[in-house]
C-alpha cells in the first residue's frame, strides 16, 4: 500500500464562491451593435443582493 500524502487546499486552487459583482458585473458596459440582449424579471429572495440573484439566471 502506498503512503498517504497531505494536500494543501490553498495551493493552486482555492474553492469557494465569489460575489458576482466582484468578478463579472460591469455596470459601465456599453452595448455594441453585434450584442444579443435578453431580459429577465428576477425577484431576489430576502437577504440576496439583486446582482447575485441575476447572476443565477
Curated annotation (Swiss-Prot):
The modification N6,N6,N6-trimethyllysine is found at residue 14. Its main location: plastid. The keyword Acetylation applies. InterPro entries: RuBisCO, RuBisCO_lsu_fd_N, RuBisCO_lsu_N_sf. GO terms for biological process: photorespiration; reductive pentose-phosphate cycle. GO terms for cellular component: chloroplast. This is Ribulose bisphosphate carboxylase large chain. It comes from Buxus sempervirens. The lineage of its organism: Eukaryota, Viridiplantae, Streptophyta, Embryophyta, Tracheophyta. The gene is rbcL.
Amino acid at each position: 500500500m502506498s503512503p498517504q500524502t497531505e494536500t494543501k487546499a490553498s495551493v493552486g486552487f482555492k474553492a469557494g464562491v465569489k460575489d458576482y459583482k466582484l468578478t463579472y458585473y460591469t455596470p459601465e458596459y456599453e452595448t455594441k451593435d453585434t450584442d444579443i440582449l435578453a431580459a429577465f424579471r428576477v425577484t431576489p429572495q430576502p437577504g440576496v443582493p439583486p446582482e447575485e440573484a441575476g447572476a443565477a439566471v
